[in-house]
């Protein structure tokens, strides 16, 4: 993916989550405490849970902070804040993976985008294509959401705007056939990346999940390694529902990555920590705005600082 200047402001984009967390922790970080006792750490754990970090991640973080306090004497609000950022960074680091093309990457690299309706999947598909394009790579898009005519039109509109070919058929067409045509086109043109936009679906919808399986089989027949990436798009504003969606798709489909979108408009961005803690799936990128350049590589340390309110990365 293309790099982004720090002036683009992840710190500012996560202000709603940071404000919600900071409001809850203001008494802890206000300098009123000479010593941080059990009551303070209990309150910290409650506030982390309320920020959608999840029970498991919140308990682990606070348990570690308690232990650190016993051995290193955390006695100031700033020391506690720094220790909190460090612990969140440690959890998030395991999910950090930038999606890049290597010299030995398959050609085309096939990326299948999946998710439920309304999470911004088609827009994220276009933004990802723009990122690869900005990095000097050729891209083809496959409009395999054939259940919604608007989805085909939306992707075609993005393709026209970006100058990226979109392989599509009519509304109601066989999505697997579209995927086949898209792969054949990408391979014949020597394209670097093929990104497939699939229909939004609930994991409990047997027919749509079967369709997704058919798309995967068709791609695998064309290239035994395809799809090389299966990326789930989730809406960060849904909080713990994003976690349940990710767990279900990981079990049903198998994922190589998760993209958390709409983080600029929610106070529930802490769910990224829960995803990193509870699922063995990377988070290659996050969505922090509506602009074409607002799909960012996920960077654990920067994200942790932006969540809690450490030194600005702007």
Feature-to-residue mapping (PLM):
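Non-catalytic terminal/linker segments enriched in charged/polar, low-complexity residues
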Residues: 1-100, 104-113, 128, 134, ...
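P-loop/Walker A NTP-binding module and the surrounding RecA-like catalytic core of P-loop NTPases
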Residues: 85, 89-314
């Amino acid at each position: 993916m293309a790099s982004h200047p720090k002036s683009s402001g992840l710190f500012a984009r996560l202000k709603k989550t940071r404000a919600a967390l900071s409001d809850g922790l203001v008494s802890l970080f206000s300098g009123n405490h000479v010593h941080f006792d059990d009551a303070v750490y209990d309150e910290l754990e409650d506030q982390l849970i309320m920020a959608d970090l999840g029970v498991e991640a919140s308990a682990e973080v606070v348990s570690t902070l308690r232990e650190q306090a016993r051995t290193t004497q955390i006695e100031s609000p700033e020391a506690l804040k720094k220790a909190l950022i460090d612990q969140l960074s440690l959890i998030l680091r395991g999910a950090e993976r930038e999606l890049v093309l290597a010299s030995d990457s398959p050609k085309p690299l096939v990326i299948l985008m999946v998710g439920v309706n309304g999470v911004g999947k088609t827009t994220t598909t276009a933004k990802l294509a723009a990122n690869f394009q900005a990095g000097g790579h050729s891209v083809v898009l496959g409009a395999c959401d054939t259940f919604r005519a608007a989805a085909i039109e939306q992707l075609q509109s993005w393709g026209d705007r970006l100058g990226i070919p979109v392989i599509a058929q009519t509304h109601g067409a066989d999505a697997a056939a579209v995927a086949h045509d898209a792969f054949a086109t990408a391979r014949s043109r020597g394209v670097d990346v093929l990104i497939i936009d699939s229909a939004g679906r609930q994991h409990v919808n047997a027919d749509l999940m079967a369709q997704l399986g058919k798309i995967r089989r068709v791609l695998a027949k064309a290239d035994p390694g395809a799809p090389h990436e299966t990326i789930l798009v989730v809406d960060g504003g849904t909080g713990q529902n994003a976690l349940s969606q990710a767990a279900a798709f990981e079990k049903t489909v198998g994922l190589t990555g998760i993209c958390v979108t709409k983080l600029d408009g929610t106070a529930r961005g802490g769910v990224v920590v829960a995803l990193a803690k509870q699922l063995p799936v990377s988070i290659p990128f996050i969505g922090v705005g509506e602009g074409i350049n607002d799909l960012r590589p996920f960077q654990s340390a920067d994200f942790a600082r932006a969540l809690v309110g450490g030194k600005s990365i702007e």
